[in-house]
């Protein structure tokens, strides 16, 4: 059985850990609101960008001059998985859930005879995927030094991805990230960004207004499509940022509660052990006095 001193040290250590988890919870809570607002503000812009491009693409359907970012390469053999995760841990299943979704997609594609490559954004995803797919990781972007994510960071990633696409390194690119829903709910999401998936209008949808474009549709698309890749990546990074702080806040709250429960149990064991030792000493003193 541990001595009383060991028990006191253990209780003190648990209390110190509880203070750390509580502080991390408060920091995550303070950063969550701003990250949530940024993610929610980016959604309408990204969705509207998709809608505008879909409208223009419908007008230029079948044009031989259509951008490869829209028309694709005509093949479906090489898939690039753009996996966006966090740079830090202590956030519950936030990172592992994104990696799990990407890994499942990769294995499914490989079982179909497809070639799979990875482009990792974030240290945690890179470290996890490297164990199984090290030779298939073609790029890794580390954002640990970035204090606040801006469009310039997403644009830089988009340029790297598009350059590899233009060089013929892959045919399809799918973006993986965590969509923020609430503090306790973050949804791992996969979104194909190259070639862009243009959804056909529903049968009962209202007729779309006809527009005349200046310059030509293909010229507009050639300018908008690369930017759209950057916009979708930027949205994913913002969603990830909000999801990370939400997951970390929830995880640290659970850790703080668990530490409190451990302290309660450890203190109970300590008090019972101390009481038993005092009782034993009293019995020994009384027995000695009676013997005299």
Curated annotation (Swiss-Prot):
Q: Where in the cell is it found?
A: Cell inner membrane
What is the recorded name of this protein? ATP synthase gamma chain
What task does this protein carry out? Produces ATP from ADP in the presence of a proton gradient across the membrane. The gamma chain is believed to be important in regulating ATPase activity and the flow of protons through the CF(0) complex.
Query: PANTHER family annotated for this entry?
Result: ATP SYNTHASE GAMMA CHAIN, ATP SYNTHASE SUBUNIT GAMMA, MITOCHONDRIAL
Subunit info here reads:
F-type ATPases have 2 components, CF(1) - the catalytic core - and CF(0) - the membrane proton channel. CF(1) has five subunits: alpha(3), beta(3), gamma(1), delta(1), epsilon(1). CF(0) has three main subunits: a, b and c.
The UniProt gene name for this protein comes to atpG
NCBIfam families given in the database record: ATPsyn_F1gamma, PRK05621.1-4
Question: Pfam families, per this entry?
Answer: ATP-synt
Q: From what organism does this protein derive?
A: Bradyrhizobium sp. (strain ORS 278)
GO CC aspect terms: plasma membrane; proton-transporting ATP synthase complex
Q: Which family does it belong to?
A: Belongs to the ATPase gamma chain family.
One GO molecular function term of this record is:
ATP binding
- The answer to keyword Cell inner membrane applying to this record is yes
Q: What topology does it adopt in the membrane?
A: Peripheral membrane protein
Q: What is its main location?
A: membrane
Q: Which domain of life is it from?
A: Bacteria
Instruction: Look up the coiled coil feature and give its residue ranges.
Output: none
CDD domains membership: F1-ATPase_gamma
What is an annotated GO biological process for this record, any one?
A: proton motive force-driven plasma membrane ATP synthesis
Family matches, as SUPFAM superfamilies = ATP synthase (F1-ATPase), gamma subunit (SSF52943)
Keyword terms = ATP synthesis, Cell inner membrane, Cell membrane, CF(1), Hydrogen ion transport, Ion transport, Membrane, Transport
């Amino acid at each position: 059985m541990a001595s009383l001193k060991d028990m006191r040290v253990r209780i003190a250590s648990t209390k110190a850990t509880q203070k750390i988890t509580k502080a991390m919870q408060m920091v995550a809570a303070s950063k969550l609101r701003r990250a949530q607002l940024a993610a929610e503000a980016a959604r309408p812009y990204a969705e509207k960008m998709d809608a505008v491009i879909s409208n223009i693409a419908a007008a230029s359907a079948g044009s031989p001059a259509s951008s490869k970012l829209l028309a694709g390469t005509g093949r479906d053999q090489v898939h690039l998985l753009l996996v966006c995760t966090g740079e830090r841990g202590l956030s519950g299943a936030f990172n592992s859930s994104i990696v799990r979704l990407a890994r499942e997609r990769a294995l499914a594609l490989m079982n179909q005879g497809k070639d799979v490559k990875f482009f990792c954004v974030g240290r945690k995803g890179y470290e996890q995927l490297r164990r199984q797919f090290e030779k298939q990781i073609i790029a890794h972007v580390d954002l640990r030094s970035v204090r606040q994510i801006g469009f310039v960071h997403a644009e830089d990633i988009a340029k790297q991805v598009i350059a590899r696409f233009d060089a013929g390194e892959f045919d399809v690119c799918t973006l993986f990230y965590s969509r923020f829903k609430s503090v306790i709910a973050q949804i791992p999401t996969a979104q194909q960004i190259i070639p862009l998936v243009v959804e056909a209008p529903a049968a009962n949808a209202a007729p779309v207004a006809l527009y005349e474009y200046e310059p030509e549709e293909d010229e507009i698309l050639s300018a908008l499509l690369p930017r759209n890749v950057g916009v979708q990546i930027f949205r994913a990074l913002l969603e990830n940022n909000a999801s990370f702080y939400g997951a970390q806040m929830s995880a640290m709250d659970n850790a703080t509660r668990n530490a409190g429960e451990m302290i309660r149990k450890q203190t109970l064991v300590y008090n019972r052990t101390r009481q038993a030792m005092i009782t034993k000493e009293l019995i020994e003193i009384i027995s000695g006095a009676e013997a005299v």
